[in-house]
Amino acid sequence: MDFVKKILHQISRKSEAVSQITFDEDYNVPDARPDVGRMIQKKGEVTIGDVQISEGKARVFGGLTFHLLYVSDGERRRICQLSGELPIDETIHLDGLTGGDKVCITWEVEDLNLHLINSRKLGVRAIVTLHAWIEELCDLAVPMEIRGESDVAVKRQEYRVVELAVQKKDVLRVKKELTIPSGKPELHEILWQDLEVRGLDLRSEEGRVSAQGELFVFCLYSDGEELSLIHISEPTRPISIS
């Protein structure tokens, strides 16, 4: 009795691990920034700079960047912003990791707390979780039919599978100029911003993958007037890559 098999290529995780980083640091307000009176909004994100791979472990370098929107202290209260970065140097142990393996890393800021020590110093507390895993390409032999036996009952079931055509990483850098709508004041200083890709559509074409979507831009800015008026601009622009 012989099995007729078909080889399927698949990506599997050889090993994975989770590492949690705790931050509890003091941060001095830069000299160019006004004194902090009252905090309005905060956010943070992680930047992965470099990953050094050795036997059984990966050393991750990067930083936790935090942003703060606040009201300045003093007689003339203004809406201001500041940004800071705390370094990341974390070693993650991964069983079976070798020099030629590909390590994938995702991050999550589980908690970010900024508290006011005084008008020129902030306390920064945060918890960052790093998820790391090793991907490898392996072959799976799937039996398709049996030959050589006539008295063997066979039950068949159809499954839809996808084939890995190519695996690569590419970085899309979008650089566009957005015009402030008429009726809005001129921009003097950007205080807060958010970017979000919406309605992303990926399509396979001859020799390439096409992506289309919308880039949502939120911008909170000051016009530089003495009253420090705040205005919001929310244009949406289409993007297309291949």
Each predicted region: which residue ranges?
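Edge strands and adjacent loops of beta-rich recognition modules
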Residues: 160-196
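Short, solvent-exposed beta-strand/turn "edge" segments of beta-rich domains on protein surfaces
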Residues: 14-17, 33-40, 50-61, 115-122, ...
